[in-house]
Amino acid sequence: MTGARCAFPVILTLWSAMAGASEFRHEILDFSDLRGWAEDDHAKALKVFTETCADMKDPDWQSLCALAQTGPEARTFFELFFRPVVISDGNPALFTGYYEPELRGALQPGGRYRYPVYRIPPEAREASPWLSRREILTGDVMSGRGLEIAWVDDPVELFFLQIQGSGRIRLPDGGVIRVGYGGANGHPYRSIGTELVRLGIYEAHQVSAEVIKNWVRRNPEAGEALLFHNPSYVFFRRVDQVSPERGPLGAMNRSVTAGRTIAVDPAHVPLGAPVWIEKEGHGPIRRLMVAQDTGSAIKGPQRADIFFGTGADAGRAAGRLRDPGRMVVLMPIQRAYAMLTDADQ
């Protein structure tokens, strides 16, 4: 099909002072500049966009959300009412992946199910930082308080559940409960992959989630010490309002969608905005996704985490991803060109 085109092709470049003294470059493109744009399934992207756009409070976005809800032809909708904008701070783009882990667990301890998934205690909310990971797991501060949501069978998978921030627990009877981020102990996150490189155990290009898990399991004592290297500890809450068939809740409190949701830095990319992804490296991706999530490691205008789905296969795919490319935010037309006025003020 032939989509609508910009009435006058234009590339407008401007520099504006944002986020302190840093310089951010905004480049307005035409849709013909987006590699692979014509080949994408725009209807899938529009469906994901409509799932969260009603929560965007800005009038420019609200008016476009109302139009999107009427069921327009998807590619035409995006090309008529948006302009592609590259926002850059001079750092190269970086794409990584995330997923929703699924662990084996039970609602009562016993047998293999010995590792508790905790709710946050009240005093941890009031202190920053609170106790470290080592202090929480080797002391008795959590004992006898009824803070356990469930017990799982693998402390390594529990550690990675805390990195992801949400996940599912499959019970012995086949049922599933979902847990979401419920707070943290206030300590900074330290990468155990980086520590393995520092110790000379692996080269940086060799490190992935699967490599780390396997090493910890092969070296139980040193593996436990490695996990304690990260003092950050994440607590959870039970999430019952989302059916197991849907994705986990993202930062907009709506389910995220595999292959169409990204986590972004909301200081630069509006939550709910469509974002064109051009991921290079192994298995290039050219796809319109939607910014529906955030992450503590996602900083900068050219940084995104792609959601791969639930379970082990999704985890392996997400763990392999660390590639360059380009992010292009689709902004309402008036908002895109208002950048010129803002830069002149």
Give the role of each language-model region.
Residues M1-F8:
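Bacterial N-terminal signal peptides that target proteins for export
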Residues S22-Q345:
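Solvent-exposed, well-ordered loop and adjacent helix/strand elements within mature globular domains
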Residues S16-G20:
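N-terminal signal peptide c-region/cleavage motif recognized by signal peptidases
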Residues F8-L14:
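Hydrophobic helical h-region of N-terminal Sec-dependent signal peptides
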